[in-house]
Amino acid sequence: MKFAGSRALCLSSVVLSFAAAGTCHGQATNILTYKGADRDQRVLDGARKEGQVVIYTGLVVNVALRPMTEAFMAKYPFVKMSYWRGESEAIASKITAEIRANNVVGDVIEGTGVGELALAADIVQPFYSPMVEALPKAMVDPSGLTAPTRVSYFALAYNTKLVPADKVPQTYEDLLDPMWKGKISWRIESASGTPLFLTNLRLAWGEERAMDYFKKLAGQKVVNFGSGSARTLVDRVMAGEYPLAVNVFAHFPVISAAQGAPVNSKLLDPVPSTGATISIPKNARHPHAALLLIDFMLSPDGQGVFSKAGLFPAHPGVRPSDVVASVDPTIAKVPVNFIPSDVINKYEPRSDEIYNELFR
């Protein structure tokens, strides 16, 4: 993207770089997968000695990342938590450069789309957290290379001043109405944008029906938005630049709507869903502190931080906030198509081809 350009290049360069870096200095990994009765104490003692942990994440700083940092350090004041925020491709590129330089700074990587790149490039190592046992089995990576931190649901965003309530698209087919020609936008440089939109319908409908739909959708002259995140695209919808945007994080519009912005979300059946994941890069400097942070983020305390930030916690015992309940498909009773990272990796090359054939 530049759908099959920049993102595909990013993925291939990550894979090649990590293959070349496979001979990087070794690291004792037994603490990462240790399950003995004294595991938690070992992690705590080791983290105390290490004294710091660095996370690379896609979390928005003021919304969730800073509150998470403050909550973690309040519980474990002897571990200084530092962070760097970026999109998934940027996180992968940053870790790539660090491994190539044999100077890995990031101890933990987290975000939507990061897991796909991590698994495809073989850049992370197995770990065990007892907190994973409480998470939905369908979201848990059996290899132990990733663990889900939060659930992402994707929806249609619309400007409430430009789209009358009785004209809001209720289905994917409604997007084919001539009134929306040239007024639909989507993100082309993010795995959770255009490729996930295409993959979702290919999986749900089958290739034949999906391709027939995509050909019709191409006639709608969908606007390729390629210069920002999902949050940025929602801001453009709020500003009236685009009446509609497909496959944005469902919580962004409703949070803005609660603050008085002219925007809202509409869940379309099936709702594409992915899990933001957390992992430990190979050769991480602070493995004990990395485990301590992961334990915290997956615990009810850490999951509560996600909930307060308007995100959807992966832990089934932690409810999302009332602000975003309206776009929780499990509450709204809208069918969900949860797509694991390995399935996204399998389907994305063809989805890239479809984009280039029909929409570029």
Where are these regions (language model features)?
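Extracytoplasmic "Venus flytrap"
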Residues: 29-40, 48-67, 189-192, 276
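Extracytoplasmic ligand-binding site segments that recognize negatively charged/polar headgroups
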Residues: 54-70, 81-99, 103-241
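Short amphipathic alpha-helical coupling segments at ligand-binding clamshell hinges
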Residues: 68, 209, 213, 285-297, ...
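A ligand-binding cleft/hinge motif common to bilobed small-molecule-binding domains
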Residues: 115-119, 243-262
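Periplasmic-binding protein-like
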Residues: 137, 151-154, 180-190, 214-220, 225-227, 297-320, ...
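A bilobed periplasmic-binding-protein/Venus flytrap-type ligand-binding module shared by bacterial periplasmic
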Residues: 155-162, 199-203, 274-287, 305-306
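Extracellular/periplasmic bilobal clamshell ligand-binding domains
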Residues: 320-360
